[in-house]
């Protein structure tokens, strides 16, 4: 806990004579200044819409050049024109009288470049310059400890650049408490009231026994460098935004590893990541954006856990839209691995997820356009009011539903660990599967829609529930299959076939329970095997649909010793128990412990002896709305 003392020592009172954080106005300076920098602008919304409403600011097109200026990425400096500060124990010397020194506190008031070297046992570097000043601090093998405040405090400036000199190793730390020195609530090792950029080819270690690692009350930009941060609270915190172009990060925190939040402006408080390598271990969220969260690329290893049941422990979290365009993610969380309180779009990326709650969850619309998603253990795999899969390879092992479309939200989290999500039957809830390869191993419903279920392409394989209280397929409204491959095996008590609006043949049969590992096969009347697949679980019913099933033809289904022949008088054979049975997406209530999944991925990929023409996933348009099932003519061979 941060201990902010109100009693000032005589030393600090003296320092305040030089470091009072005034609202400085523009004035001419004599020191060498930085290059002219263009103004950074926030991203704007393109106005694209999706089913479901949200008041959150949700930009859909972002230009990376709007996120970073040329100066943000510039790591060079002219040493001959720079002011040199030498730190030594409890004293500081400067090559210029433009720096005010009081004991172990140096105050910089003039625009320019300052090179710091050496070590301070207990001191501060303060920037208190004009509100137009751009100041560069070069850390060249610097160690600064501040027992009662920030090691670096930006009180006033237009923008400050902290550059890690090439090959340098730098350490900044706080001693475990913060003493108030002005009206600002300083609570981090690096604390900035102004825009702050970090870059360079060196290393920065930050140890915050209390408070946060790095805080900017405006924009926090990191363009390059290596950062090892251990903080009692947040690791990186930006009020207006966190923007990361590149870098290597190892962050261990008592709260969120990355945290951005601006309660006064819904267009701010966002996190944008263009790339980098991230190893995040948090007792809160891995990343928490009060606005939107957009990841272009990068490598992410995220672990969250805590004994505090009231704390959110998600991997990636956004109050606004969450978009992933690429990257490699290994996420192990107690709460949702990837979560948006609004809409979410996954355009690409490789995900390996273990979670005690949902794998990928959106309170509104979830769209998967591509990527490789493996959810080894979860409560529910994919969840949103509307779930749309246009392409990709998805493997889900769930203790409840594999894919769930339902109204409501779970902003408080912990559907699996602490009880069901706050969902109810919703006519707006829909699942659209238009392409890709989906393997589901679910203890609850394999695919569960509180509204409608539409399959237009792709391949879907479900090792469904062994309990008769759930079904491999469950929907409350209507369903249809117009393309693709579907094999869904599970218990027979709640078994459902696809609906009468289907334009391709679909068969539901029930039989005596077959052992796990028993192969299901479909053959035509000439004995040609059309498709075969092996379930990882016991089952007593199966739904099979492929483009090869046509009206008027006869087919043989085998499952272990069971064999039956069916004649397709219509495109739908066997309706099951009716329209949905128990309401789909009923909030689960499985409520059990964190799942101990076996990593099973919903059976083995089927062995097909024909070319399955008509099975290539559709070439979807790029507007990412994903909300209306297309009129499919193409083939659907998967990814």
What function would you assign to each model-found segment?
Residues 2-639:
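A composition-driven surface/loop motif
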């Amino acid at each position: 806990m941060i201990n902010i003392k109100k009693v000032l020592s005589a030393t600090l009172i003296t320092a305040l004579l030089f470091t009072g954080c005034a609202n400085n106005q523009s004035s001419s300076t004599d020191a060498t200044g930085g290059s002219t920098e263009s103004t950074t602008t926030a991203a704007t919304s393109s106005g694209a819409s999706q089913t479901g409403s949200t008041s959150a600011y949700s930009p859909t097109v972002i230009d990376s050049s709007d996120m970073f200026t040329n100066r943000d990425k510039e790591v060079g400096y002219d040493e001959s024109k720079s002011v040199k500060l030498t730190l030594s124990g409890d004293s500081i010397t400067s090559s210029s009288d433009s720096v005010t020194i009081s004991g172990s506190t140096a105050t910089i008031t003039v625009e320019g470049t300052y090179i710091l070297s050496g070590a301070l046992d207990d001191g501060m570097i303060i920037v208190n310059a004009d509100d137009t000043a751009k100041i560069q601090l070069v850390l060249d093998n610097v160690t600064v400890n501040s027992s009662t405040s920030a090691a670096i405090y930006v009180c006033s400036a237009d923008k400050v650049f902290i550059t890690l000199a090439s090959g340098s190793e730098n350490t900044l730390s706080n001693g475990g408490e913060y003493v108030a020195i002005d009206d600002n609530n300083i609570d981090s090792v690096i604390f900035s009231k102004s825009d702050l950029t970090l870059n360079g080819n060196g290393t920065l270690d930050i140890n915050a026994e209390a408070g946060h690692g790095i805080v900017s009350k405006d924009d926090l930009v990191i363009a390059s460098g290596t950062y090892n941060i251990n903080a009692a609270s947040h690791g990186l915190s930006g009020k207006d935004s966190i923007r990361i172009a590149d870098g290597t990060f190892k962050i261990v925190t008592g709260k969120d590893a990355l945290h951005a939040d601006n309660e006064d402006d819904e267009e701010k408080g966002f996190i944008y990541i263009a790339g980098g390598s991230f190893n995040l271990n948090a007792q809160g969220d891995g990343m928490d954006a009060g606005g939107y969260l957009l990841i272009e690329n990068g490598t992410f290893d995220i672990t969250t856990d805590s004994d505090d049941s009231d704390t959110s422990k998600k991997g990636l979290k956004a109050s606004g839209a969450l978009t992933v365009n690429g990257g490699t993610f290994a996420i192990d969380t107690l709460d949702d691995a990837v979560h948006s309180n609004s809409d979410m779009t996954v355009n690409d990326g490789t995900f390996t997820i273990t979670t005690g709650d949902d794998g990928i969850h959106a309170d509104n619309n979830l769209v998967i356009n591509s990527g490789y998603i493996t959810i080894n253990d979860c409560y529910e795999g994919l969840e949103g009011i509307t779930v749309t899969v246009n392409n990709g390879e998805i493997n889900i092992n769930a203790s409840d539903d594999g894919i769930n479309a339902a109204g409501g939200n779970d902003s408080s989290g912990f559907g699996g660990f602490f009880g069901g999500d706050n969902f109810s039957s919703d006519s707006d809830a829909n699942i659209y599967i238009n392409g890709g390869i989906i393997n589901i191993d679910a203890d609850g419903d394999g695919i569960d829609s509180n509204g409608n279920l539409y399959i237009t392409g792709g391949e879907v394989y479900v090792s469904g529930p062994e309990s008769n209280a759930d079904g491999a397929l469950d929907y409350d409204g209507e369903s249809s299959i117009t393309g693709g491959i579907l094999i869904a095996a599970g218990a027979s008590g709640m078994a459902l076939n696809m609906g009468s609006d289907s334009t391709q043949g679909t068969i539901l049969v029930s039989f005596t329970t077959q052992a796990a590992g028993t192969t299901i096969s479909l053959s035509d009347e000439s004995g040609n095997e059309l498709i075969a697949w092996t379930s990882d679980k016991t089952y007593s019913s199966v739904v099979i649909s492929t483009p090869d099933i046509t009206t008027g033809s006869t087919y043989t289904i085998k499952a272990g010793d069971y064999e039956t022949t069916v004649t397709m008088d219509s495109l739908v054979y066997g309706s099951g128990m009716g329209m949905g049975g128990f309401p789909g997406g009923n909030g689960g209530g499985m409520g059990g412990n964190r799942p101990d999944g076996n990593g099973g991925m919903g059976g083995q990929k089927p062995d097909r002896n024909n070319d399955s023409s008509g099975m290539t996933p559709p070439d979807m348009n790029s507007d990412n709305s994903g909300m209306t099932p297309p009129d499919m003519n193409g083939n659907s061979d998967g990814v």
